């Protein structure tokens, strides 16, 4: 979580919305990993389904899904300055309850070599994936 906060700060993100199950942002290890960025990014803990349900339909919601659009294809991201980016749990991904709100599903493709699934990593660390998504989004 600390690395996500620090990365978000680097890319100009002002708010991060978390489910109540997310690690406490004031955990000493999280604070250390933020390297001061916790003072620049507001962290909100709330019921995500309720929050998504009240958002205006015009707000683009980008979600990282294995079957999403390759982030390197044209128009993978909406051309809005304001949007919401959903990053899922490393082990479980984005819950079905939250998936229904995604308007722009995207995927970071793997370029790992090997034909068998056991020859490739099954996923990226969520903080690394967050950095890749934010960097690609900021290209717009």
Q: How should each PLM-predicted stretch be described?
A:
Residues 62-121:
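Active-site/ligand-binding-proximal alpha/beta "capping" segment
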Residues 1-68:
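RNA substrate-binding interface of SAM-dependent RNA methyltransferases
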Residues 12-15, 38-41, 66, 83-85, ...:
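Short, surface-exposed linear patches
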Residues 45, 88, 127:
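Active-site-adjacent beta-strand anchor residues
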Residues 27, 32-36, 96-140:
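Structured adenosyl-cofactor binding patch, chiefly the S-adenosyl-L-methionine
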Residues 19, 47, 74, 99, ...:
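Amphipathic, positively biased hydrophobic alpha-helical segments used for protein targeting
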Residues 1, 35, 87, 92, ...:
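Short glycine-rich loop/turn motifs that provide flexible caps or phosphate-binding loops at active sites
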């Amino acid at each position: 979580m600390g690395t996500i906060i620090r990365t978000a700060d680097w890319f100009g993100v002002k708010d991060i919305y978390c489910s109540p199950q997310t690690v406490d942002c004031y955990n000493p290890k999280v604070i250390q990993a933020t390297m001061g960025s916790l003072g620049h990014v507001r962290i909100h803990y709330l019921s995500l389904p309720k929050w998504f349900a009240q958002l205006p339909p015009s707000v683009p919601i980008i979600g990282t899904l294995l079957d999403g659009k390759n982030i390197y294809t044209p128009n993978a991201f909406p051309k809005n300055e304001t949007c919401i980016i959903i990053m899922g749990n490393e082990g479980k991904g984005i819950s079905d309850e939250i998936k229904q709100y995604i308007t722009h599903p995207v995927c970071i493709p793997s370029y790992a070599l090997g034909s068998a699934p056991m020859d490739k990593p099954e996923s990226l660390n969520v903080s690394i994936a967050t950095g890749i998504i934010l960097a690609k989004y900021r290209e717009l």
